[in-house]
Design a protein with these regions (language model features):
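A generic structural signal for residues located within well-ordered alpha-helices
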Residues: 116, 273-279, 326
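Short pre-catalytic strand/loop immediately N-terminal to key active-site residues, enriched for Gly-Thr
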Residues: 265-270, 318-322
Length: 461
């Protein structure tokens, strides 16, 4: 096939383009901005556009298909030309479905935990030597791409999210996959992440359940109230239903042990959310024919997905974790996980907030007491980003202090100041948790960890 990507530079889109080229398709693409690592990956694959920007002339009648990225607007000149010529236009999820019609489609959905559950299943299947394709939203250890598509693998694992498919299609992406096995980990409406109402948000998950193929299977978290609601509201669907819940566990000397029958299996991950994720991953693997012993032997050495409550470094009894999390509920959950795991250690938590998080008072208000379990709390706001949004820095700093309502809070707006703070902080007896909505606020987390863990004179008591 001759396939053209409109908005080829996205993290998932450029991986799909490279995968299709490797399968022998003729692939081209356009974008108005391409950054790393997409730029280098596309250049290495010989798929980097000859010019940056949109050009309707590249859309010709001999194209078999257009794959439209979310980044492209409805008035994109290449899109308009393709519509005029009647070329078949696919959104990303539509195309993935077309390529996986003859496979067992396993789709993992939920507000939180999708990437982690998919990566757990991938880890187990890989260790057991199973052949499978996958589509995941973040780079995972042991896998060199976000997408693997082949003609031979009998199974495809898909991280399915609830956001719209493209600029000309407001259906949720996960409505297109028609899973044989689906999992919903949780359903949590968050005004910081979506502009739709809570009812509309929950409805997307009900419609997702409706798309499960006849006699397919829904795996769901029995401990999530909203999951139970959407499952109950779709009781007429002719599918199998298999609920799961968090397993029993113990923590000893900073290591979590999961109870499996009479055995205590040590894990390399922490937090109740991850334990629930393991239960969900195991249930899916059961439906794929994996035996219990095989699963737990394989999962015991699973490490967190990259930047999802991920261990960074430890020294002299102190540990540093990082987490791709900035919404109020995830902030609270991740802090609780680290505090529970290391209950005898004090915790310093650093959260980066973006201008979007603080633009509206009602969104900021949702953070109230979200860091209450952390002994010290630091909110980082990049003052340059704040200025670009014409926000008065002093006003927003005052609001942050008032809203978070934390007795040991510091608000920092400058990178140099943040470096100095970490260098001066007495880390003995403390752990550190980095939390960010972006790429770790543009810094090297390992470097920050070194500054925090370095021996220094006591400044805090």
């Amino acid at each position: 096939m001759r396939i053209h990507f409109i908005a080829i530079g996205g993290s998932v889109m450029h991986n799909l383009a490279i995968s299709l080229a490797r399968l022998g398709h003729q692939v081209t693409g356009s974008d108005d901005q391409i950054v790393e690592p997409s730029k280098s990956n596309l250049r290495e694959a010989g798929l980097y556009p000859t010019e940056i920007g949109w050009n309707a002339d590249v859309i010709t009648e001999d194209l078999d298909a257009i794959i439209l990225g979310k980044h492209a607007d409805a008035d994109n000149p290449e899109l308009i030309k393709a519509q005029e010529l009647g070329i078949k236009i696919y959104s990303f999820p539509e195309f993935i479905y077309e390529q996986s019609k003859n496979k067992i489609r396993v789709v993992i959905a939920g507000t939180f935990g999708k990437t982690t559950i998919v990566s757990m299943i991938m880890h187990v299947l890989k260790k057991l030597g199973k052949d499978f394709d996958y589509v995941v939203g973040a780079q995972l250890e042991g896998f060199n791409s976000l997408i693997k598509l082949t003609s031979s693998a009998p199974i495809i694992l898909i991280e399915g999210d609830e956001y719209y498919a493209s600029s000309i299609d407001d259906h949720s992406k996960f409505h297109y996959y028609h899973p044989n096995i689906a999992l919903i980990s949780n359903v949590h409406w968050d005004a910081n992440k979506t502009e739709v109402s809570e009812d509309v948000y929950l409805q997307q998950f009900e419609e997702f359940i409706d798309t499960i193929v006849a006699k397919g299977t829904l795996v769901y978290n029995k401990e999530d109230v909203n999951v139970l609601k959407v499952v109950g509201d779709t009781k007429d669907c002719k599918i199998n239903r298999h609920g799961y819940k968090m397993p029993n566990y113990t923590i000893n000397k900073g290591i979590t042990y999961i109870e499996v029958g009479e055995e205590q299996i040590p894990l390399k991950i922490i937090g109740k959310q991850n334990l629930s994720n393991i239960a969900g991953a195991y249930t899916v693997c059961e439906w794929l024919g994996i035996k219990r012993g095989e699963f737990y032997e394989s999962i015991s050495d699973f490490k967190s997905s990259i930047r999802y409550l991920e261990f960074v470094k430890s020294e002299e009894g102190s540990v540093v974790y990082q987490d791709f999390a900035h919404t109020p509920s995830k902030l609270y959950t991740s802090i609780h996980a680290v505090k529970e795991q290391f209950s005898n250690k004090k915790l310093l938590t650093l959260i980066e907030l973006t201008p979007y998080d603080i633009l509206k008072d009602d969104k900021l208000e949702m953070y109230r007491h979200s860091m209450i379990e952390s002994d010290y709390a630091v909110v980082f706001l990049n003052k340059n980003s704040i200025k670009e949004k014409n926000i008065v820095l002093g006003n927003v700093v005052d609001k942050i202090f008032s809203t978070f309502d934390h007795t040991n809070m510091t608000v920092i707006t400058d990178f140099d100041e943040l470096n100095f703070y970490l260098e001066q902080f007495e880390s003995q007896g403390f752990n550190l948790l980095f939390m960010s909505s972006d790429s770790n606020i543009g810094v090297n987390v390992l470097s920050f960890a070194d500054k925090f863990l370095a021996k220094k004179v006591k400044n805090f008591k």
